[in-house]
Amino acid sequence: MSKVHQSACPLNCWDSCGFLVTVDDGKVTKVDGDPNHPITEGKICGRGRMLETKTNSPDRLRYPMKKQNGEFVRISWEQALDEIADKLREIKETSETTAVLHSHDYANNGLLKALDQRFFNGYGGVTEIVGSICWGSGIEAQSWDFGRSYGHGPLDIYNSKHVVVWGRNVSRTNMHLYHHLQQVKKKGATITVIDPIFNPTAKLADRYISVKPGMDGWLAAAVLKVLIEMGRTDETFISEHSVGFDDVKELLKTVSLEEFIVKTETSMEELEYLAGLYADGPVSTFMGLGMQRYKNGGGTIRWIDALVAASGNVGIKGGGANFGNVQIGESFAKTKLTLPELKTTSRSFSMMTQAEEVLTAADPAIEMIIVTCGNPLTQVPNTNKVRQAFEKVPMTVAIDSIMTDTAELCDYVLPTATVFEEEDIYYSSMYHHYVQYGKKLVEPQGEAKSDSWIWSELAKRLGFGELFEYSTQEFLEMGLSSLEAEDVTLERLKEKGHLPLPVKQVPWDDYQFLTPSGKFEFTSSLAEQKGFSGSLQLNVPEESVFHNEELAGKYPYTLLSIHPQRSNHSQHVPFIEKLQHVQVDISPDIAAGQDLQDGDEVVIFNDRGSMKGKVKVMKQAHAKTINIDEGMWAAFGGSVNALTNDTNSDNGMGSTLFDCLVGLKKA
């Protein structure tokens, strides 16, 4: 019998879509959009629809596996859990619990995925990952400037006179914002896209401005310099609601507009156009993630924040420096789920440098890695070093629903349930403010189990099973307990399917910022407290002609690795045959200079690694620019991260994935 159920998308994405899922005789057969969702309105992308394929795939992991003599063999849950618990017990008795590394990412936005922290805190505390390969630099940057990274509600864009989409290809990664762009353009708003690549979002724009990769912060600084010279800054905001603007003005005096133009590879006309735009608010600015994946990435976001603030576009309807929206995640009582007070010790490795830190760790060395919600061998920079790190560690465990590149490398693989096989609530701290309920629709395939069951069973074996003596409903109610006064309850979520969270739709409208000064900080005291310079700086990408001329001569092209169109990072690649090859997008000047055409096979290389792929000439892109979509599996040509840089960004919390020079030649 066929039945349609409300559900939600778990993927790490801006849009967090509402679903209608069809179940026939205990099997998920179709995933559609929920037309009653107030933001996503029934429209979903192929990545969401593919969750049906992933759930029913014959390649699903269905049984616990152990590697013996280089081959995986099926074992029982009892054996798997006993042996993993034995190793955890041995480490606790003979070493320190920080000899265990919990390597995790954000493959699933379910609230109960946080129960892994409950387990590791109950164990005593382990080595945890801090920072983010995705958006860490920008989140940290906005915490320095505003106190938090808060975004405007999706519908506030209808109050904007102008919209600037800066480094975010919303047609690929934020489809419901793209819909709103179409609508506000019809109502008379202008749309400007700033990006090194002329993408489908740029086709919608009234104006497209190409900027040299990694120099977006310099562009924002140049526009701010023009604004100051025009006398068009918002002096009331600057004098009453900010600190440190004099530092900005003094720095900008040291760089001429001619130097800004040369380094950003833009024009004076473009600078004047943008300055006039920002002075003619309200202007909403939507920032993407790629431009903060450089050594100077945090500074890039800070300069755009500074431009938005100084032009008077903070705290007003139709304005905003929209990057993340972490007020969504802050709404939940996560510490009731994670119990951080149980930790007796801790150690942290950077998300970006975790491989190097595993290889060099001492007192204690890493003896065990447990991977959840991630695929570090594909997604973490410098793939070859990640492989070395995993191969060095005595025991490695992956908890996943498919045999990823990382799982292939591990000693144990534990099969986990997929989104429609377990109950949870879902949200995203990136865009809209609705939380959604996803009930269990079908039974897990084979012997797959929910993550919470796995943690519960391990906890029982290690003597703290009482931490997991709660039902799924009780855990969900814990997470929602902070919202009871707002009538956001599990009962109402089950009834409605989705509910709005009580967050601001226009952040900072009271000009009460969460910085130490209570004001917008052009010079950040929080940065200084953390040991960084608080003043804005004009730094350049580490792998660039401006910083390392010799390296740029050896490897003349900038490599970007943007999000794929049809896969959420690496998750969908094995299910879509058309994705299963490496496509090398090159700017027209590279094609002309090397006599390359679509379909030509090339080798891309630098000192970290190399890979092969087939050329696709971009119609319009900044000179000397190459893109290879991230997420590709080794079986289909390997991850672009064989080439990428594994250093930390300027504020220590983000990746430098795009700070990457390469060479290219015909294969």
UniProtKB/Swiss-Prot annotation:
Plastid as a keyword of this entry, yes or no, is no
> Record's superkingdom?
Bacteria
What Pfam families does the entry give?
Molybdop_Fe4S4, Molybdopterin, Molydop_binding
Q: SMART domains from the xrefs?
A: Molybdop_Fe4S4
Query: Cofactor note, please?
Result: Binds 1 molybdenum-bis(molybdopterin guanine dinucleotide) (Mo-bis-MGD) cofactor per subunit.
Q: Which cofactor does it need?
A: Mo-bis(molybdopterin guanine dinucleotide)
**InterPro entries in the cross-refs:** Asp_de-COase-like_dom_sf (IPR009010), MoPterin_dinucl-bd_dom (IPR006657), Mopterin_OxRdtase (IPR006656), Mopterin_OxRdtase_4Fe-4S_dom (IPR006963), Prok_Mopterin_Oxidored (IPR050612)
User: Keyword set for this entry?
Assistant: Iron, Iron-sulfur, Metal-binding, Molybdenum, Oxidoreductase
Q: What class of enzyme is it?
A: oxidoreductase
Recall the GO molecular function terms of this protein's record.
Answer: iron-sulfur cluster binding; metal ion binding; molybdopterin cofactor binding; oxidoreductase activity
4Fe-4S Mo/W bis-MGD-type domain: which residues?
Answer: 2-59
Family matches, as Gene3D superfamilies: 2.40.40.20, 3.40.50.740, ADC-like domains (2.20.25.90), Dimethylsulfoxide Reductase, domain 2 (3.40.228.10), Formate dehydrogenase/DMSO reductase (3.30.2070.10)
| Enzyme Commission no | 1.-.-.-
Q: Which amino acid positions bind [4Fe-4S] cluster, per UniProt?
A: 9, 13, 17, 45
Q: Does the keyword Oxidoreductase apply?
A: yes
Name the family the entry cites: Belongs to the prokaryotic molybdopterin-containing oxidoreductase family.
What this protein is called in its record is Probable oxidoreductase YyaE
The species this protein was found in: Bacillus subtilis (strain 168)
Q: Which gene encodes it?
A: yyaE
